[in-house]
């Protein structure tokens, strides 16, 4: 593997808005599956603390910590019963304070999930709300009378299937839940509710965290006529008119007084709307887009009816957002998270999955314009899991999709194959630390079964191999942060190359008269390229023994090259 050099002659400071998060690398931790310190089979905060030196070695700057708040765990912590307490299985508030302090000693910041579209039905706010129709917190949630015939108020459906309305016999009304019935939606129309949210956010920021990943934020505004949906799907609609008043207030009242990173999960946002969400004056620092990771999901969202796609579709999704960010705003670069399957299974043919293709895939996304996110295990090449039956799965969405497939006439084998391909449990299997029992994740039986390939794919093996994917990610991070090319990677203009190729993905980045090209072969066959530019120097590659020709390039299967090119091109 061709290595990169350390920065020797850093370029002069650029005259632009250089917020700290624009040059940071974020590592997402799903605590339940990261490292278990006490042998109960569940990852915890002390486990995260014990692995901080591993993350420091990788070179990341920020940890995004998935929910650790007090929760009944109906949806793995996204059903919060107390925003200002830690779930017992993860530890205590003292553990959280220690994590913040220990991370700070290593120059690592912590951001948390902010889940404010809904709470748990066991949150004190909801318990008060459902206790009496006249309670002052009744309007903190969305309650409606049913129809005269006894049916729910409208035909809206929840993300997890079925009606998004749940009947409460005590008060004889329905409450709204966009997700599980254990996750009632908050009523953002109520100013007292909004102020309570802002107060909670401020409390966490003053405790020392450095920002939030804002969960499902485009769900917070509902159509106030609550009319039936007449679309092909009746799933509750997102990004409704009037949402920007709420988001602007959230930013001003809770975010603006602190120098923080905010990244929004914002389904339903078009490219035209990106400036409002993530422009220089947007509501958030950046947002997660879905087009490039959901190419295989059709409009109906049925995993068992996958949408066909090819490399041109992936390239267009990337190009559309990158071209926008040339002019304004900032991107969140990612291929994996806790809601997605593993990227190697999604983007690489099964027979071609391995270190070479994994390094190619890492190169392609990591050097785009934006802040890169690495999901736990991605840096060692963890892959999807194939459990033998649906009973082995924990993910609510997987269970719903499986039974929906059976209802629509698919066989058990076909339904399970869809779950293998798309389940959120693919990314939630415990982190593979070594080849010992339970992959070194825990001394006890893990809450979710370990992937069977843990003996070959694990951290211990990766750290022993100088040519491993782990060290390749480490080099990519160095390239972004401490090389002569750091500023062109962070701030350079994006330009498509070979845009019509079905096998090659390539782009250029240019800043202050310095230009680099990223060229990757997504195929298992060698390809020869005639170049319209001159390669001056190869900066990084996933192959050894490169044959360099100034205006011609031969790429071997899944080969990727980062090179400096003539800036006059």
Where are these regions (language model features)?
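Carbohydrate-interacting/catalytic domains
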Residues: 2-70, 97, 101-103, 371-374, ...
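Generic, well-ordered alpha-helical scaffold segments in large soluble proteins
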Residues: 51, 102, 200-207, 249-253, ...
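Hydrophobic residues within beta-strands of alpha/beta enzymes
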Residues: 63, 212-214
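Hydrophobic "anchor" residues on beta-strands that sit immediately upstream
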Residues: 109, 113, 211, 261, ...
């Amino acid at each position: 593997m061709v290595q990169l050099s350390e920065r020797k002659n850093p370029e002069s400071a650029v005259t632009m808005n250089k917020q700290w998060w624009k040059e940071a690398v974020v590592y997402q931790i799903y605590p339940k599956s990261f490292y278990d310190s006490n042998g109960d089979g569940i990852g915890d905060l002390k486990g995260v603390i014990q692995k901080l030196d591993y993350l420091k070695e990788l070179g990341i700057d920020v940890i995004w910590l998935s929910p650790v708040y007090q929760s009944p765990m109906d949806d793995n912590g996204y059903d919060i019963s107390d925003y200002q307490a830690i779930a017992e299985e993860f530890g205590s508030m003292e553990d959280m304070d220690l994590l913040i302090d220990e991370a700070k000693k290593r120059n690592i910041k912590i951001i948390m999930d902010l889940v404010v579209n809904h709470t748990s039905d066991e949150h004190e706010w909801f318990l008060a709300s459902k206790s009496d129709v006249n309670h002052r917190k009744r309007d903190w949630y969305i309650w409606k009378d049913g129809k005269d015939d006894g049916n729910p108020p409208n035909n809206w459906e929840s993300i997890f299937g079925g009606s998004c309305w749940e009947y409460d016999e005590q008060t004889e009304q329905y409450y709204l839940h966009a997700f599980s019935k254990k996750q009632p939606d908050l009523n953002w129309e109520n100013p007292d509710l909004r102020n309570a949210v802002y107060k909670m956010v401020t409390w966490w920021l003053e405790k020392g965290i450095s920002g939030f990943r804002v969960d499902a934020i485009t769900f917070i505004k509902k159509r106030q006529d609550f009319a039936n949906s007449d679309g092909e799907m009746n799933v509750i609609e997102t990004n409704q008119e009037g949402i920007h008043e709420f988001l602007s207030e959230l930013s001003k009242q809770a975010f603006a007084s602190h120098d923080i990173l905010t990244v929004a999960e914002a389904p339903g946002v078009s490219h035209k709307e990106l400036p409002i969400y993530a422009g220089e004056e947007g509501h958030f620092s950046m947002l997660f887009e879905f087009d490039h990771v959901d190419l295989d999901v059709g409009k109906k969202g049925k995993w068992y009816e996958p949408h066909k796609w090819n490399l041109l579709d992936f390239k267009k999704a990337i190009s559309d957002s990158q071209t926008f960010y040339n002019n304004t705003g900032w991107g969140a670069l990612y291929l994996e998270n806790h809601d997605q399957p593993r990227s190697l299974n999604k983007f690489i043919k099964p027979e071609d999955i391995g270190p070479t293709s994994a390094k190619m895939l890492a190169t392609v996304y990591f050097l785009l314009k934006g802040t890169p996110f690495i999901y736990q295990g991605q840096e060692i090449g963890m892959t999807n899991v194939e459990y033998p039956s649906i009973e082995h799965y924990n993910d609510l969405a997987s269970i719903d999709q499986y039974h929906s497939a059976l209802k629509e006439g698919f066989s058990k084998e076909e339904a399970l194959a869809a779950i293998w391909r798309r389940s959120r449990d693919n990314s939630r299997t415990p982190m593979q630390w070594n080849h010992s029992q339970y992959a070194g994740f825990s001394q006890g039986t893990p809450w979710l079964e370990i992937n069977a390939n843990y003996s070959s794919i694990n951290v211990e093996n990766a750290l022993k191999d100088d040519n491993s994917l782990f060290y390749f990610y480490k080099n990519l991070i160095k390239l972004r942060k401490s090389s002569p090319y750091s500023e062109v990677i962070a701030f350079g203009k994006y330009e498509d190359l070979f845009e019509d190729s079905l096998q090659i993905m390539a782009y250029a980045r240019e800043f202050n008269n310095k230009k680099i090209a990223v060229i990757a072969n997504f195929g298992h066959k060698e390809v020869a390229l005639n170049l319209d530019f001159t390669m001056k120097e190869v900066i990084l590659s996933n192959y050894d023994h490169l044959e360099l020709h100034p205006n011609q390039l031969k790429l071997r299967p899944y080969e990727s090259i980062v090179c400096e090119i003539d800036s006059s091109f």
